[in-house]
């Protein structure tokens, strides 16, 4: 029986937006003798149990490939963070020069009315409208193998994990949605407690006619 057990790792963090420096995801390690999420893994699961997220399912995932994929994405993000730091340093230098008093600036700059107007506005405390540096976190396909930006573009993913530099797309890999089979049964009544009481006349139909290994095995059992 132990030979049939497969490793499954869950994360109890329901959303990547709850990540912070103080709140870290907790991972639960379990084993399963079933066919994983390909067949009724959510059968009779309570709402609390269904809130867990799958990090690794040995029924469908390859551990070595998963680690390589995560390492590759982390390396890509690290390279982009280095580029961002370099660009940020240049931006800060330019900003400090722009916000310096008018009297300390080169007199040649006064020839440009636009530059002069900009300096006066800064000295008066006005904030110029700037383009949003951050892309929408929903604009990324977190399950895509392709990176969201090219080498020539800067990565503006919002840091969701308390300054560690891990972007939303990278964090979401470790918090992907639960995979459910289309054949899974879902009950609404008393889902929070797991106490499923059928109402009078309630009927739940499970499709068993299609040619699948599970249905064929079921037919063999009831013969």
Curated annotation (Swiss-Prot):
Region feature (Disordered): 78-117
Signals that turn on the gene: In carbon, ammonium, phosphate and sulfate starvation conditions.
Compositionally biased spans, kind Basic residues: 78-95
Compositional bias segments (type: Basic and acidic residues): 96-105
Domain of life: Eukaryota
Protein name as annotated: Protein UGX2
Source organism per UniProt: Saccharomyces cerevisiae (strain ATCC 204508 / S288c)
Gene (name only): UGX2
